[in-house]
From Swiss-Prot:
Acts both as a nuclear p53/TP53-cofactor and a cytoplasmic regulator of actin dynamics depending on conditions. In nucleus, acts as a cofactor that increases p53/TP53 response. Increases p53/TP53-dependent transcription and apoptosis, suggesting an important role in p53/TP53 stress response such as DNA damage. In cytoplasm, acts as a nucleation-promoting factor for both branched and unbranched actin filaments. Activates the Arp2/3 complex to induce branched actin filament networks. Also catalyzes actin polymerization in the absence of Arp2/3, creating unbranched filaments. Residues 679-710 have a biased composition (Pro residues). It is a lipid-anchor. Residues 601-619 have a biased composition (Low complexity). InterPro entries: JMY/WHAMM, JMY/WHAMM_N, WH2_dom. Its main location: nucleus. One of its GO terms (biological process) is cellular response to starvation. The gene is jmy. This is Junction-mediating and -regulatory protein. It comes from Danio rerio (Zebrafish). GO terms for cellular component: autophagosome membrane; cell leading edge; cytoplasm; cytoplasmic vesicle; cytoskeleton; endomembrane system; nucleus. Keywords: Actin-binding, Coiled coil, Cytoplasm, Cytoplasmic vesicle, Cytoskeleton, DNA damage, DNA repair, Lipoprotein, Membrane, Nucleus.
Amino acid sequence: MSFAMEDAIESGWVSVRPNVFEEKEKHKFVFIVAWNEIEGKFAVTCHNRTVQKRSAERDSLLEAAEGELAAAADTDRRTARPAHRSPGRERSGGQSSPSAAAELELLDAAEDAELSARQDSSWAGLFSFQDLRAAHLQLCAVNADLEPCLPALPEEQTGVWSVLFGVPEMSARDTDALCFQLQVYLGHALDTCGWRILSQVLFPDSEDAEEYYESLSELRQKGYEDALQRAKRRLQQLLEQQRAVERMVELLQLYSEQDEAYGELVEATTELYHYLLQPFRDMRELAMLRRQQIKISLETERLGPRRVESLRREDEDWQRKAHTAVLSIQDLTVKYFETTARAQKVMYERMRADQRKFGKAAWGAAVERMERLQYAVSKETLQLMRAKEICLEQRKHGLREEMQGLQGGEDAMARLDQLEALYYELQLQLYEIQFEILKNEELLLTAQLQSLRRQMSERQEEVVYYDTFESPDAMKATEDPAQPQTPRDDINKLQQRTRQLEARRGRITAKKAYLKNKKEICIINHTQKLQQRQAGAHGVSQQPLLQDEEDEEEQRLSRVSQERQRTLDRLRSFKQRYPGQVTLKSTRLRLAFSRKKALRAEQMQTQTQPQTQAASVQTDDAPAPLEPPSAVPELCRPDSFLSLPPMGGAVAEAPPSAELTSLPPARELLLLDSSTSPMSPPPPPPPPPPPPPPMLEDFPPRSPPEPQSPLGPFSARFFDSSQLLNARKKLRKTASLESSQWRRASSPMDEVLASLKRGSFHLRKAELRVLAPDPDEDDGNNILAQIRKGVKLRKVRRQERSARAIMADSADPLTRSIHEALRRIKEASPESESEDDTPTATDWES
């Protein structure tokens, strides 16, 4: 209800203040009553002895001060010499005159206060017999105990009879006795009714009577506050009774009464704060309406420059009023949720204390209420924190606008630093509130999950009983096509809801981590800003600090460049010592090449026998008859491999076009390694072999082969495929062990140089190709993978680009400092609420 409607409904009613006649301090009053012969009336005089006593003390103090001033003036006149006065004494005399004038002004003010106090300390008036009776009737209306206390007054003639007979004559003795009785009566009336009422009856003044009345809006607010206090006292009484309850039945009944009392508390609080919010809501609506009218006038009407300027000033004024109303609404909202959240927390804590007094079976009857109360506590606290968050956001917005509106001046930079530090403090408070919000959201989810799990356990433990049937036909006849859902369907729905809540809790955890990182950035910026302010307070300029940072950066860059040059020199010396084409491949490329090479070797094994590699093979010393060449497949090998000497008389029978040789005797067998072949002595010159097969083109060519003698095909009995595979596995294990030892013992660059020196690496020229994305790499570092997953890219606004351009082109140091401060506070602040995936307030209603 608006205030205009209240005025229309409540017109004609007045509200008197309840304690308007209470006296804050008791004073001593004295009444003097005398008979005035000329007027024929009683002269009543009242003196406030308390005020008169204070005035007398004040007079004595003032007289003492005047005496000291007079003595000081006499001393100055005696010590002064008019004929020979020095300039210093002239200056001292000129300086003493203002102090004397000030003291005189104080004396005048004290005299005025004394005069007003004396006027308020004494009252006088003339009262006839009829006037005294009328005053007595008014005092009896206040307190009926005064009715028999008025002394007997003679009857006074009225009208024509007063002209004919005049005033009744009384003797002096009767008059004095009646005056004494009236003095006693007035003293008793003072004690019974109080000075405020008696003074207004006997000595009425012409002051405004508004002090005795109060506005109806204040009366209504007082009524709402009284209702709220009654609801609080009722709930507090029930909470006190809860401690003494020992039976579960009584406790459940008390819980229902507490719920009713809390409902009354919420209702009273809502009515009170709705009434308090109403004027601010009206002001906000009025301000928005007036601003809209001003906007329409500026857009549609043809106005002069003065009128346009006045409308703009009026618009700014209404905007300030609307902003003030919004801040007041937010503050009242915070107070409302503080009241409700505090009451629910007390109820929940008392219920947890009751849970420890009862067993699990007995407490099962109150589990639902406890879950409901826990959910309500988290929800109210969440709304309270969101209201506080809105208030802090408004303050941050005001600070940001003030920073943007700073003008050039002497204290502009200092004010900018102060505003930025204040912004960081508000942001840290906001982070604490946001952490509390996430905590309460997680508590809400936990309460819902506990309730769902309890419902699922109840569904699983539920026993369903069916009626018995005499025959299957009777069972089919009673089948209902529209059967209710089975417990399994209910459990599936509850499980689905549980998964949704678990996913939402995961998002809350991610938001916590994000806010934690932002808070660390804010703390770092705030610490730096405080250090800069302290350095500025001690007179330390920022220029040496910047110079030190630049020098440190230059030293770091020079150190990196020197290290790079040293590495290049080492590689150059290595190339000079070991000439040849060397290409260093990264670990990632080496792994890819090794996988590709292993795949090619497996493909070759499916087509032919395994290739001969450098290995130590142990064979039998006794010769064996060789199988025909068609029965044993020939082994293909690179040209760089050493040929094996023949055995016995099998050499004469070998065809001249044989590509491979047989194995030598065991006593002549040596370790053959293709990597160490340049260092070993060359074999005897064999005849030139035929051209290599096409499948061996991938192997790098080595030194041209020497002519060898034709040999027959070797027997599988001496060098079969299983022995070759075992030898290959041993070589791989040895190479991996050796490489791991070298990796642990030295740095990566030393490992590469040493391996190249001993010839264990066969390097080839790397091909330039686009590599596929690494499966082990995190998708968060790959923007293309993020785009494929559907991550939305935030569009850079044109205003931001223009602002950056302005900041880059601006030569004003204040403008650059403002932009830098805004950039820092933007880094320390979280992203907008529209970009995160936090659940809205409506999600918690389910």
